[in-house]
């Protein structure tokens, strides 16, 4: 299944706010209308919608998300929390959380087009897994820095999560540590996502 490229507002009306997909928000009251129409949601549908929320927010294909679930299942600790850590530490998501891109698809384009360096080397793989002490910088070229500066100026000022530091004037971000669960940028019940996949096997 390919990455979603359809109408974004349609997704947030059904699933709620997906800040990684779009900066738009559902209209006030739309959640209530959706709830009134779906009072008798099956447990399967509830799990499916949580899985879809995760997939669309981080901009993943079904195959990519399944791969992350399997990796998380083999790691120590809570599968759900490890899954969120894996997704949050992707390079495209780190750029988004730093405010260098307005959405994760936009961050992915920056990476794909070679505008981003990690520890002094160009990384053009959006799924690159960042680690503590990684330094993310914008390429020292005018078009790259102008592009990111425009995005920084356009992004709504938000408090950075504890695991990241941004040095705006140096066009530099620092990964301080692995993200805490409380700092995840999406309202999600990750246990339902794990349950969804465990029932598919």
From Swiss-Prot:
GO terms for molecular function: rRNA binding; structural constituent of ribosome. The keyword Isomerase does not apply. SMART domains: Ribosomal_S4 (SM01390), S4 (SM00363). SUPFAM superfamilies: Alpha-L RNA-binding motif (SSF55174). Residues 89-152 form the S4 RNA-binding domain. InterPro entries: Ribosomal_uS4, Ribosomal_uS4_bac-type, Ribosomal_uS4_CS, Ribosomal_uS4_N, S4_RNA-bd, S4_RNA-bd_sf. Transmembrane segments: none annotated. One of the primary rRNA binding proteins, it binds directly to 16S rRNA where it nucleates assembly of the body of the 30S subunit. Belongs to the universal ribosomal protein uS4 family. This is Small ribosomal subunit protein uS4c. It comes from Capsella bursa-pastoris (Shepherd's purse). The lineage of its organism: Eukaryota, Viridiplantae, Streptophyta, Embryophyta, Tracheophyta.
């Amino acid at each position: 299944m390919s990455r979603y490229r359809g109408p974004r507002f349609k997704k947030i009306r059904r699933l709620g706010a997906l800040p990684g997909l779009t900066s738009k928000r559902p209209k006030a009251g739309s959640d209530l209308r959706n709830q009134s129409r779906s009072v008798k949601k099956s447990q399967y549908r509830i799990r499916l919608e949580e899985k879809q929320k995760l997939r669309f927010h981080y901009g993943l294909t079904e195959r990519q998300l399944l791969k992350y679930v399997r990796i998380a299942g083999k790691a120590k600790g809570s599968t759900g929390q490890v899954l969120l850590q894996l997704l949050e530490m992707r390079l495209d998501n780190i750029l988004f959380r730093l405010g260098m891109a307005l959405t994760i698809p936009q961050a992915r384009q920056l990476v794909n087009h070679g505008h981003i360096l990690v520890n002094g080397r160009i990384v053009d793989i959006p799924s690159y897994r960042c680690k503590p002490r990684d330094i993310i910088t914008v390429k020292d070229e005018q078009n790259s820095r102008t592009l990111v500066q425009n995005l920084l100026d356009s992004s709504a000022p938000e408090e950075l999560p504890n695991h990241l530091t941004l040095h705006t004037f140096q066009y530099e971000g620092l990964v301080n540590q692995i993200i805490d669960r409380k700092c995840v940028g999406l309202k999600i019940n990750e246990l339902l996502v794990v349950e969804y996949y465990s029932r598919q096997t």
